[in-house]
């Protein structure tokens, strides 16, 4: 595997750096750099800018707004976005439901949903997890039973991130409760959030804020033409989605920024002179380089748009390093880290 950028890739990187600096408002980038949570308006504004320049969904098929980029170019696009503190396109739209519709949806569903999904004219949320179906997702119980030209949907979804902003939710539903295997009988259904019978309840944190929700469905009627692909094939589509979701999830660029901030603060307050702290910071910097190389390997193994199962490692290790960076930042900030 080549570990250095080619001259052409370096030029591509520099073009993106210039674009992010000149086209994304500085105040949006500064809020993103310092904020602890997503700003809805900034996400929408940025994604519309990216979409207007053909840069919102490079991982999609070209005919639907994607780019004929190599995996390395796609990784550069994301890394430079993170390093510039640019809000990333909404992952529910760009990495989850969009690729599933593009790969498995009917022509009518593609024409109806893909363009507004790329432009963030539709804000999607994910309806997968249930109270008794989290890590064992195939145990989901929410049913969608065919009744003429509609599905009658009943059940509950939980941990629905940013569902309070969503216009639509893409759900895994059980369309054949009598299927012999729990992975069978599952379908992929698109549901408008303002459909009668849907109730959204926030799951609040101790400070009163929230970003995840419970969603209840009681006799919700969903048009049958909002089924993606074939009935009872939803588990196949879910595996495809989860593979795409993990690509780019390591947040290498943002962790690099956090480590640079830690080094700057530690230099200013003298903590970098502590050999133990300096060694821990150096180890974290080495670990992020190792993760970046793993990310490059995963990207280079994703030719042809096929998700790489090894991307699961990126989610795990990326989260560990984000947590480590936060712990180091709290330590270096001292009393200033208190709310």
Range-by-range predicted roles:
Residues 149-150, 154-201:
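A short core secondary-structure module
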Residues 1-13, 337-339:
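Intrinsic disorder at enzyme termini
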